[in-house]
Amino acid sequence: MKKLLIIGITVIMFFFNNQATADYEKVFFDFKIDSIGGEKIDFQDYKNKVVLLVNTASYCGFTKQYDDLQKLWDQYKKDGLIVLGIPSNSFNQEKNNNNEVKEFCEVNFSINFPMSVITDVKGDDAHEIFKWAKKNYGKSAVPKWNFYKILINKEGKIEDTFSSLTNPTSNKIVSKIEKLLQI
């Protein structure tokens, strides 16, 4: 019985291990992505910053979270927070092209935080940043739906992930951001 208990605890610890302390071969800052405006976003530019990476979509029930993502950006960008939106059609709820997404975000939500081009976030065609996240943090870093959030610390490692149900301005997210920003 004791042996079974030890095996059970070991299995549980394996599945709930905090991968944020994993020995990363690469960190977040080693990647790049195309911006929705046509430039290249080099994550090296975000070194020593805290990044909230969010896969977004225009036709989702969570699309209203754009407002709160913009509020986070406005409130904490001076302290070193980067909100990075990654529009995705991985869940079949995004517009047809980047110009439509850009216009939608600017007109409806006055978005001015960095946004990438429409990007796959899961499966074999996922952008390398999402493959990196899965490799280093496990399945909990794979977006389950639109507006899934991955919090990256100043060292370029995954600190935490948050479901689509977790509002960007929730105490759960804001307290982690403030802790990482040391404010």
Residue spans for each PLM region:
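Positively charged n-region of N-terminal signal peptides that target proteins for export
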Residues: 1-4
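Bacterial N-terminal signal peptides
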Residues: 7-15
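Terminal helix/beta-alpha structural elements that buttress the NAD(P)+-binding lobe
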Residues: 29-30, 117, 131, 153
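Short pre-active-site segment immediately N-terminal to redox-active cysteine/selenocysteine motifs
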Residues: 49, 55-59, 87-90, 155
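Thiol-/selenol-based redox modules, centered on thioredoxin-like
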Residues: 131, 135-183
